């Protein structure tokens, strides 16, 4: 027992050393310069500042991006969840080392749950955790995705442990309920916690892929029981019921995130547009073309085994001393070639661009194929099924019949994009089955004849393919990319030579790894004699060591010292520019800024200081996305053309055209240069304005079209879902969109105080008046009241703004964002998390009592 504990302790220490040794920069305080995290810092700055200063009044809304939006996908809701602190404890440490360590530990438990001996299980954990995709997403800043992937093997391990505890009787053996039930209950409790934490990472798409693996496991288990062990069906249902009930508690503990996310998603790009497209009614879900834009090509699948089969990354590194491209650029006198060599356009596959391949490891792929021919257990089938599903989903538009079936008929699938991500399923299934068969070989589970047949077939497929790549690369493509079209031919030729060289290098590497693995297995299977058991173990450990060397070496291409910076360097991108300082002198509590020095709708850095017209989010409100496509982008292009020839700021302001939709969003400043004064948009409508009429649309298509013809200063455009709203004015007839008395007489409304979740206005009106606010309408959570508590109904105006009808007099109007779903979901989280903790304690106590 002590020896066993020492082995496990040694492996854990090894994992800690590996995680921090792979990213030693974190020990000196450096962080990964993650583009997505810098974007997050910009978009969440207002929210984080407010919450830090007002811990008892946390905001669920931010005005910092896209005119305003819920913070559901930024900071979320953590109220009520008693398991949150336990979750945070697991992530203690310096990231990304803490992420890698969490993944290593979970994958190790997963391998152990399959019965793999510890030393080989450690090799399998490395194969899982150092797949190139993990390191790529760490490098770009997809931290939530990485944490979700790190928790995934914990969930699988707990589920497998639960079923094995209930069903592991040997043929003819019959354990009593006291022998199997406590361990089964404990496994279900661990499953609930692992599932709770995996969902808490907040990446539903990864959780969806986890569900595919789990369902495959359960279905195959049912078939196996029906064919082989019908007597155990009762225990299966007990284990399943425990997993279901406790799993629901784990899910329920996350209700404070899941329910607001579900409510918000209905209003976003994931919920679909109200507009008709190509004659079809508005669909609910992402557009299929958008969802499948990043589809893995059939021709890319070999890079599961040969990393640079399609060039690797769109901005990949080469050896400057050996690169034909760098040599050419040096001959032409280009400077700074050391930096250029780190970001050449090497990828030549079908995706728009990529951070790198989904490299699973040449050894892992070889072992997986070996297992398909050699392994006879049920595990082969429940691991093969999700593998095939993952490949089919990742192919996206290259395999449209399969993609359309999932998109139109499988629940929630049409909410996801970047379908190539489905290959993460293989990060688990390939190492699981591969190291399962390796463990059986080490345990002397196969005779030489069976191994020879399956081994030679697997070696021919992997090693033979790699050899063919080395000898005849021209068989596998032109090595030209679509992005090469705008380059000079001599440069394209140099890039092609580099791509072929990288292709051959990695094919040769994979050939060597597969050959070494095959040779070690052949050596392990030599005729039995004294010491043959040790020989098999040495071979297994040597193969695990090769996996470690290969996966970390390839991984360094995607996460290395060049990607780390000091905290000061990272923060420098958020220093105030002269133009920011000029804008921030404005004492008005709220106005919006259009920053043309960045990609307006794909960059959230301006949100750090300003209420930004643009930003970045794949889950922005759908109506705002419609506004971008129909009006904001055309108006921005018109603005750029109008001021393009101006020599001074005043000339640019004089040339500034009237931009009705940007103006209704209260876009007061336009940034053209970091170091110059901003343009002032004299047409901005302000924070709120009275209107005296309405134009009404019968459909959503008519509603958005009317924005282009109405005088938005004088009338409100109302959609069909607000047809009952009465605007206190004379009716607007025909095409006369502007009432004669649109401006009103002496009435005024002014924003007096701004907070992200509360707005205060003072107004004076001689009669009931309709008002439009330059604030984004959201159907759930915003309320408006007068100073005496009288509620005021809000409606949607001008496609995406808020409107209200105010009573006559001098009043204060308060708008506040307090979504009911936050209170309800926090209560559910509180109940479920408390029950989960109590049941876990009871399950642990029961197990030890039975043992005693």
Predicted regions and their residues:
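Transmembrane-helix motifs of polytopic, lipid-linked glycan transferases
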Residues: 98-115, 364-366, 433
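Membrane-interface coil-to-helix junctions
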Residues: 15-104, 126-138, 142-150, 282-360, ...
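Transmembrane signal-anchor helices characteristic of membrane glycosylation enzymes that use polyprenol
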Residues: 7-43, 246-260, 389-392, 467, ...
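Polar, glycine-rich mid-to-C-terminal structural blocks
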Residues: 206, 236-296
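Active-site-proximal, structured, solvent-exposed surfaces of multi-pass membrane proteins
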Residues: 366, 668, 720-852
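Transmembrane-helix signature of polytopic, membrane-embedded enzymes
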Residues: 111-130, 173-186
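Contiguous transmembrane helix-bundle modules in multi-pass membrane proteins
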Residues: 125, 140-150, 162-163, 184-196, ...
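Extracytoplasmic/lumenal acceptor-recognition loop(s) of multi-pass membrane glycoenzymes
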Residues: 45-77, 81, 297, 309, ...
């Amino acid at each position: 027992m002590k020896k066993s504990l020492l082995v496990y302790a040694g492996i854990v220490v090894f994992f800690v050393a590996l995680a921090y040794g792979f990213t030693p920069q974190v020990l000196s305080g450096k962080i990964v310069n993650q583009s997505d995290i810098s974007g997050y810092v910009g978009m969440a700055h207002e929210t984080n500042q407010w919450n830090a200063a007002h811990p008892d009044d946390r905001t669920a809304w931010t005005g910092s991006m896209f005119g305003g939006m819920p913070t559901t996908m930024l900071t979320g809701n953590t109220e009520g969840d008693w398991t949150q602190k336990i979750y945070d404890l697991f992530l203690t440490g310096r990231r990304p080392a803490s992420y890698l360590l969490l993944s290593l530990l979970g994958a190790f438990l997963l391998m152990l749950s399959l019965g793999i001996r510890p030393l080989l299980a450690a090799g399998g954990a490395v194969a899982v955790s150092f797949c190139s995709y993990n390191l790529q997403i760490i490098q770009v800043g997809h931290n939530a995705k990485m944490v979700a992937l790190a928790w995934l093997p914990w969930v699988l391990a707990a589920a497998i442990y639960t079923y094995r505890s209930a069903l592991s009787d040997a043929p003819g053996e019959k354990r009593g309920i006291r022998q199997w039930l406590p361990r089964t209950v404990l496994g279900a409790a661990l499953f609930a916690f692992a599932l709770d934490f995996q969902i808490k990472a907040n990446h539903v798409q990864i959780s969806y892929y986890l569900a595919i693996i789990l369902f495959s496991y359960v279905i195959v288990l049912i078939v196996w029981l029906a064919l082989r062990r019908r007597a155990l069906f009762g225990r299966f249902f007990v284990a399943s019921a425990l997993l279901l009930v406790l799993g629901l508690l784990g899910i329920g503990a996350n209700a404070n995130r899941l329910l607001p996310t579900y409510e918000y998603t209905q209003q976003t790009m994931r919920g679909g547009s109200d507009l008709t497209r190509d004659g079809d009614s508005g669909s609910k879900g992402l557009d299929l073309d958008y969802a499948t834009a990043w589809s893995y090509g059939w021709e890319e699948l070999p890079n599961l085994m040969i990393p640079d089969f399609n060039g690797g990354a769109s901005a990949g590194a080469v050896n400057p001393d050996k690169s034909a491209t760098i040599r050419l650029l040096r001959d032409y006198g280009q400077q700074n070639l050391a930096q250029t060599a780190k970001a050449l356009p090497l990828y030549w596959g079908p995706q728009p661009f990529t951070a790198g391949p989904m490299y699973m490891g040449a050894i892992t792929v070889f072992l997986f194929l070996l297992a398909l021919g050699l392994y006879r257990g049920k595990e082969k089938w429940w691991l093969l099924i999700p593998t095939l599903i993952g490949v089919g989903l990742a192919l996206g538009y290259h395999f449209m019949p399969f993609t359309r079936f999932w998109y139109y008929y499988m629940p929630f699938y049409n909410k996801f994009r970047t379908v190539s991500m489905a290959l993460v399923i293989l990060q688990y299934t390939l190492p699981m089955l591969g190291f399962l068969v390796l463990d059986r070989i080490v345990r002397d589970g196969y005779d030489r004849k069976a191994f020879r047949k399956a081994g030679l077939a697997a070696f021919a497929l992997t090693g033979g393919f790699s050899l063919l790549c080395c000898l005849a690369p021209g068989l596998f493509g032109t090595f030209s990319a679509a992005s090469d079209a705008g380059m000079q031919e001599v440069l394209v030729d140099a890039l092609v030579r580099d791509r072929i060289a990288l292709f051959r290098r990695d094919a040769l590497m994979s050939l060597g790894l597969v050959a070494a693995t095959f040779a070690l297995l052949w050596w392990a299977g030599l005729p039995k004699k004294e010491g043959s058991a040790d020989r098999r173990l040495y071979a297994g450990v040597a193969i695990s060591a090769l996996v470690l060397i290969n996966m970390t070496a390839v991984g360094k291409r995607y996460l290395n010292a060049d990607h780390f910076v000091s905290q000061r360097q990272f923060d420098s991108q958020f220093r105030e520019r002269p133009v920011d300082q000029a804008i921030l002198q404005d004492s008005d509590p709220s106005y919006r800024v259009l920053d043309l020095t960045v990609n307006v709708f794909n960059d959230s850095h301006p949100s750090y200081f300003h209420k930004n017209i643009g930003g970045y989010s794949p889950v922005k409100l759908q109506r705002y996305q419609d506004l971008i496509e129909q009006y904001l982008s055309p108006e921005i292009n018109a603005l750029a053309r109008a001021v393009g020839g101006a020599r001074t700021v005043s000339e640019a302001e004089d040339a500034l055209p009237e931009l009705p939709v940007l103006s209704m969003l209260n876009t007061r400043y336009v940034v053209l240069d970091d170091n110059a004064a901003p343009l002032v948009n004299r047409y901005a409508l302000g924070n709120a304005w009275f209107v005296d009429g309405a134009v009404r649309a019968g459909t959503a298509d008519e509603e958005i079209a009317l924005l282009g013809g109405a005088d938005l200063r004088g009338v409100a455009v109302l959609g069909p879902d607000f047809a009952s709203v009465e605007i206190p004015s004379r009716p607007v007839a025909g095409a006369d969109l502007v009432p004669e008395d649109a401006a009103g007489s002496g009435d005024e409304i002014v924003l007096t105080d701004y907070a992200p979740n509360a707005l205060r206005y003072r107004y004076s009106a001689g009669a009931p008046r309709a008002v439009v606010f330059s604030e984004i309408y959201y159907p759930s959570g915003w309320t408006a009241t007068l100073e005496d508590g009288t509620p005021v109904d809000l409606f949607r105006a001008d496609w995406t703004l808020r409107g209200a009808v105010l009573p006559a007099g001098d009043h204060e109007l308060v708008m506040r964002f307090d979504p009911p779903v936050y209170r309800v979901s926090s209560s559910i989280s509180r109940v479920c998390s408390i029950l989960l903790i109590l049941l876990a304690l009871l399950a642990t106590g029961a197990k030890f009592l039975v043992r005693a």
